[in-house]
Amino acid sequence: MTEQTPAPQPPADENSLIAERRAKLGALRGQGIAYPNDFVREHFAGDLQAEFADADTWTPEALEASGRTVRMAGRLMAKRVMGKASFAQIQDESGRVQLFLQGNVLGDAYTAFKGWDVGDIVAVEGGLTRTKTGELSVKASALRLLTKSLRPLPDKWHGLSDVEQRYRQRYVDLIVTPEAREVFIKRSKIIRAMRAWLDARRFLEVETPMMHYIPGGATAKPFTTHHNALDLDLYLRVAPELYLKRLVVGGLERVYEINRNFRNEGVSTRHNPEFTMLELYEAYATYHQIMDLTEQVIRDTAQSVLGTTQVSWDGADIDLAPAFRRWRMDEAVRHHNPEISAADCTDREALLRHCERLKIRVKPSYGWGKLLLEIFEATVEHTLVQPTFITDHPVEVSPLARSSDTEPGYTDRFELFINGKELANGFSELNDPEDQAARFQAQVQAKDGGDDEAMHFDADYIRALEYGMAPTGGLGIGIDRLVMLLTGSTSIRDVLLFPYMRPEA
């Protein structure tokens, strides 16, 4: 039996409130008006608030003289009944607006309103006015209930204080937490801005398979599934890389995809089993040019969405305007570990001794490249606060990257780190089919040795390379982490509408 989180039980007073609301719904059913669907909305709260924001120009008299009549709908977020007149507040996707309700104008609808509950969805029609406190209001001439809410919203002063409940019941979180709603609006704008940036530079958006015959494109453990009709095991993709590079072989020289990847790995504040990636490839580009592209698309996206290139993320003030630092991995390791010499960086036995001294656990199968990466992750990664490209990774940990022409054992690869977190990974692509086949074979041997994240041998991809792939640069940007950066979110779950959670019992 798998471990499950117990389903939260509503308190007794909440149960009684639900029972009362169900009784009200029963009365509406008896009248045949439980869930009407004939109201046509014409106006939004946010648009009205923006249009009539100037209280000096739009006085109550000016609003009445305008003759504007609005038809709106939204969720009832507050109500204040005061005898013959009442106030209410409704919320739609754009914001909130106040309603001014009069019994002598609304008649039976006003009587019905007194029995409505916060959370109900209502429709209103009327003119515009402004209260003595200066608040824009809809002076209702017609009012009706569209949807009866059966569950009470959280207390307005405390909201959803249970973080896990916020993630499980995102639909409630979006209703009562404006900050959460704003994060997901920004997420949409970020993705839209990146698409526009790439489209303007002649990149072609494509769609590649989500289920793969052979998992590949990244060193990660895949999810498996089974196609019944074909009696065939398949894998949810860990990355679209090998399919996108097949398209470059086919002559689509600038391609990108923004879509989901799936990796059967741990869950943390930075990791979710399914996540969104931007992956792109450009023929005749080197990893230096791809670093330039990475820097510019992130900087321009921030400016487009936020209006600034300065952000605060998890306690750090980040400036995206200056040129991003570029630092070789071995140099960064030596800078933070003066006892490691240049010769040590490619000496397996020396690196093993350093790992032992640093209390870094390693496996017997690790070569010097993997050991160097382990030391980097343990001693350097968390120190990279301002945007930094770590470059020239060892071949051992870069099975798809082009080998360096000047540094044996290293590759033309980079990773971008901001505030100790990896946001992007790219390289000059390996387009030598014989070298690629040899690296695939090394990955197969690593898998046979117990490395669950090692790649499989993809013979069809080798065949594609044998037709010839132009010199190419590639890039992957973690959209979820980029959204975290640009919204100041500290957990990946805060930028995923429905993050992975253990099922409720």
Swiss-Prot record:
| One GO term of the biological process aspect | lysyl-tRNA aminoacylation
Q: Which cofactor does it need?
A: Mg(2+)
Chain sites annotated for binding Mg(2+) 2? 422
Pfam assignment, any one? tRNA-synt_2
Superkingdom per UniProt: Bacteria
- Location of the protein in the cell: Cytoplasm
Cofactor: how bound:
Binds 3 Mg(2+) ions per subunit.
Q: What is its EC number?
A: 6.1.1.6
Catalytic activity, reaction form: tRNA(Lys) + L-lysine + ATP = L-lysyl-tRNA(Lys) + AMP + diphosphate
Cellular component aspect of the GO annotation: cytosol
User: What GO terms are given for molecular function?
Assistant: ATP binding; lysine-tRNA ligase activity; magnesium ion binding; tRNA binding
InterPro entries attached to this UniProt entry: Aa-tRNA-synt_II, aa-tRNA-synth_II, aa-tRNA-synth_II/BPL/LPL, Lys-tRNA-ligase_II, Lys-tRNA-ligase_II_N, Lys-tRNA-synth_II_C, NA-bd_OB-fold, NA-bd_OB_tRNA
Q: Which UniProt keywords apply?
A: Aminoacyl-tRNA synthetase, ATP-binding, Cytoplasm, Ligase, Magnesium, Metal-binding, Nucleotide-binding, Protein biosynthesis
Q: Which residues bind Mg(2+) 1?
A: 415, 422
**Assembly notes:** Homodimer.
The entry assigns this protein to a family as follows: Belongs to the class-II aminoacyl-tRNA synthetase family.
HAMAP family per UniProt? Lys_tRNA_synth_class2
Q: What is this protein called?
A: Lysine--tRNA ligase
**Native organism:** Xanthomonas axonopodis pv. citri (strain 306)
